[in-house]
């Protein structure tokens, strides 16, 4: 069992406000959260930080989330990092594609509440073998 402050999360988004929101929610629970504006910056940050979890937006201008995800899974140092898709694309077909075809660990649609984000993060970390104290 680990303290949440030992858990590193990278949030890849094209909107600074969404990164700030995720940081606010997760840092209040003690997580170490790093934000990246866009896919290219996100891949570099994942390489540098080696996080325990990635929160990934799908629709970004420089490189979409599916491309980031594919590059992660093709990289020996990144392929085992769990990913939660965080996107405004709420259509059920996108959820089916994300969870079943790409094997994404979870999927949250915007807007989401703090409890929904925290529940998904806790669940995915648990499935990855990382137990959070007090969670």
Language-model-detected regions and their locations in the chain:
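Charged docking surfaces used in two-component/phosphorelay signaling
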Residues: 20-28
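Alpha4 helix (beta4-alpha4-beta5 surface) of REC/receiver domains from two-component response regulators
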Residues: 23, 67, 90-107, 119
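Helix N-cap/capping motif at the beta->alpha junctions
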Residues: 35-44, 65
């Amino acid at each position: 069992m680990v303290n949440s402050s030992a858990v590193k999360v990278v949030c890849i988004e094209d909107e600074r406000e969404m990164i700030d929101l995720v940081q606010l929610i997760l840092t209040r629970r003690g997580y170490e959260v790093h934000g990246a504006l866009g896919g290219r910056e996100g891949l570099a940050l994942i390489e540098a930080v080696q996080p325990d979890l990635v929160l990934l937006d799908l629709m970004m201008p420089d490189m979409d989330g599916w491309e980031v995800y594919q590059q992660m899974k093709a990289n020996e140092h990144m392929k085992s990092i769990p990913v939660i898709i965080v996107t405004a694309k709420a259509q059920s077909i996108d959820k089916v594609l994300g969870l079943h075809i790409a094997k994404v660990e979870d999927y949250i649609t915007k807007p989401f509440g703090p409890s929904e984000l925290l529940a998904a993060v806790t669940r995915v970390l648990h499935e990855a073998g990382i137990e959070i104290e007090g969670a």
